[in-house]
Amino acid sequence: MISTLRSALLALTAAYAFSATSAAPAAAQTTKIKMVLNWKYQGPQGMFFLADDKGYFKQEGLEVTLDQGNGSGAGVPLVANGTYDAAFGDVNALIELAAKKPDDAPIAVYVMFNQPPFTVAVKADSPIKTPKDFEGKTIGGAANDGALKLFPAFCKLAKFDCAKVNITNMQPNLREQMLMQGQVDGVFGYVNTIRFSAKLMGVEDSQLRYINYGDYGMDLYSNAIIVSKKLAKENPKAVAGLVRAINRGLIDSLKDIDASVAAVAKREPLIKVPVEKDRFIATLQSEMNHPEIATIGLGNVDPERLKKSIDILVDASNLPRTPAVSEIFTPAFLPEAKDLPKKLF
């Protein structure tokens, strides 16, 4: 099975490589790329801004606009409908779209979050101890939150009744406030997003607990660089350059975390730098540091693991079809294996 999956990915890589040579421009020109990030400007996004500040995008012939996002799931449809050329978005939202509208779905080209960050946060003294305890309770989340979108799959895997859980939507900036004020019993999100947003409100780690999806069989990839199929087909050189520049920015961020967070503060002066530095370190530790990177490198995927992720979502969410691994991710635009980070610390 693994060899079959790898063969499929290699075939797709060859197809994109052919496009890259046949579509190469006759003369150097600047390509504009609009990219939406996963959330408001925060510490873990420093690699994108370092790539910009150090001229890595420019060296690749790119002019990249990096906009704030409204959730990891929100970027995928924005790339699909042409509003953006690229996104830092959730692979699982991509799988769902590919299952429903394969012709519209974009494709992941560099997977950055290789450990599942999805969670429901509750107050430390909450009676909610297990997923079954969600029944009869109210959980809130932003409409495009990745954990909210995956909740039906979580219900099935963790064996509790989604129909007995009251779901309410809220503005992202009100999430932690509504939880601590008791307006909801739990909130959807990424562990570190909630944890550090709560810190900014003065909430200590000891005041929160997390019911993590990954503890109940949802071994999923998460955020990735996602591009439109149109861009990948018509300008593969630009996609490869985008990935190469971001990878260089990430390597620089790992070498100098302070500089990485400073690049974020340059765009959003109101951030609390010490908190955002801690947020970035925690993200590296818990969302980007899967043991597989020692072998395949950060940015790449294990095809068999990704296939299992696809199967989990298709089955649990009753999706109409099962996308192939090659529909979700292509390694065609990755830098050479020697240039991918194999160790984060």
Description of each model-found segment:
Residues G55, P77, N81, I95, ...:
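Solvent-exposed, polar/charged alpha-helical surfaces in well-ordered, non-transmembrane soluble domains
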Residues M1-A11, A20:
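Bacterial N-terminal signal peptides that target proteins for export
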Residues M35, L66, N70, V109, ...:
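A residue-level marker of the well-folded mature domains of exported/periplasmic proteins
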Residues A15-P25:
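C-terminal segment of classical bacterial N-terminal signal peptides
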Residues M112-V122, E204-L231, V243, A282-M288:
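Periplasmic-binding protein-like
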Residues K233-A316:
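Secondary-structure end/capping motifs
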Residues A28-Q181, D185-N192, I211-Y213, M218-D219:
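Short, glycine-/small- and polar/acidic-enriched structural segments
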Residues E304-F345:
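Conserved C-terminal helix/tail region of periplasmic/extracytoplasmic solute-binding proteins
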